[in-house]
């Protein structure tokens, strides 16, 4: 149909892989953040999605060929990147490096999770360091940009893939279109921040 469609990690796993074994599900990765309403927002996201966090990672296979797969969930707090997301992605890259496997990351994010402040921004450097170690080991990293891929995710690991592909007309950018229009006091083109124009 030449257009993107937002999918959950489970949906994406079912169409992308023959086998999938999820990692880091039993880990008690919790963050203590004193931001008003944050606990309630996380609880609601868990109830709505049936997921613990905004990323699912694990070992996948296509035609018996293994690779590490990480899929961000746009339905869990808009796929925002906090400390748990950063830790799971970092561990995924480290495990891929240790096992000498390629990794595919399907990005979908509104950016850094504002409720976690500077700790969410630190995940950009943390994940990027793990990406670099994987790269220096001579291993393949493929990024699949899905709708939306914005903010700190775009500014870090989303654009570090050896191969970067995108869903048609997916929103890809750093700051949101409205923020840029308000700052520049100009109307931007309709196709601004579509994958085809990035």
Language-model segments: which ranges?
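Glycine-rich, charged/polar anion/phosphate-binding loops
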Residues: 53-56, 159
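Intrinsically disordered, low-complexity segments enriched in small/flexible residues
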Residues: 1-51, 59
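Conserved active-site and cofactor/substrate-binding residues in soluble primary-metabolism enzymes
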Residues: 4, 8, 84, 122, ...
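Charged, low-complexity, helix/coiled-coil-prone segments
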Residues: 21-43, 63-78, 98-105, 134-147, ...
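N-terminal-biased segments
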Residues: 38-48, 87-88, 107-112, 156
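Short, exposed beta-strand "edge-strand" segments with a Pro/Gly-rich flavor and a Y/T-containing core
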Residues: 1-7, 78-80, 189-190
């Amino acid at each position: 149909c030449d257009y993107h469609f937002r999918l959950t990690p489970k949906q994406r796993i079912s169409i992308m892989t023959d086998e999938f074994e999820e990692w880091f599900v039993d880990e008690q990765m919790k963050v203590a953040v004193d931001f008003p309403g944050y606990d309630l927002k996380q609880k609601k996201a868990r109830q709505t999605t049936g997921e613990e966090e905004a990323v699912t990672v694990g070992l996948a296979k296509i035609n018996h060929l293994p690779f590490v797969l990480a899929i961000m969930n746009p339905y869990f707090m808009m796929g925002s990147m906090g400390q748990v997301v950063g830790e799971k992605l970092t561990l995924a890259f480290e495990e891929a490096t240790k096992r000498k496997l390629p990794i595919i990351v399907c990005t979908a994010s509104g950016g850094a999770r504002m409720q976690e402040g500077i700790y969410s921004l630190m995940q950009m450097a943390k994940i990027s360091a793990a990406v670099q170690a994987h790269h220096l080991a001579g291993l393949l990293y493929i990024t699949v940009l899905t709708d939306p891929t914005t903010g700190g995710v775009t500014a870090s690991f989303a654009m570090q893939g050896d191969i970067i592909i995108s869903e048609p007309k997916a929103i890809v950018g750093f700051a949101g279109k409205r923020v840029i229009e308000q700052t520049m006091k100009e109307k931007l083109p309709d196709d601004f921040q579509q994958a085809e124009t990035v």
